[in-house]
Amino acid sequence: MGISLDNGIRISLSDIFEGDQEHAFATTLHPDGRHEIVDVEPLAEGSTSIWNSATTGRRYPTKWVVSIPMLKARLCVEPFVREQEVVSPIGEHKYEGASSVIGQMQGEPVTGHAIVELVGDWN
């Protein structure tokens, strides 16, 4: 998930599964050029609003609450349109959702936009 906030902060989120282990982290780029890698609460736990693809039968979450404790951030990510699956005739189908972001960071309201990419089985 890539997030661009109106306060100038850019966030790249990763949520990786290895067996039954989930590893979530974010790389942040601040307007002054500072770069940080910080822990994120697991994204799968904050995902809701499951959309079922009529084309592939895949299920994808389409709303997320992103919590980044070190940045004192809680961001709600929701797609502009739910149906944003990329169907591949030769490979893995995936969800690439252009989304809006609204929330709080460091006690201040923030808004922005995001692109969400989901690969794999979300059943």
Language-model segments: which ranges?
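Structured soluble/peripheral alpha/beta segments that form catalytic or ligand/cofactor-binding pockets
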Residues: 1-123
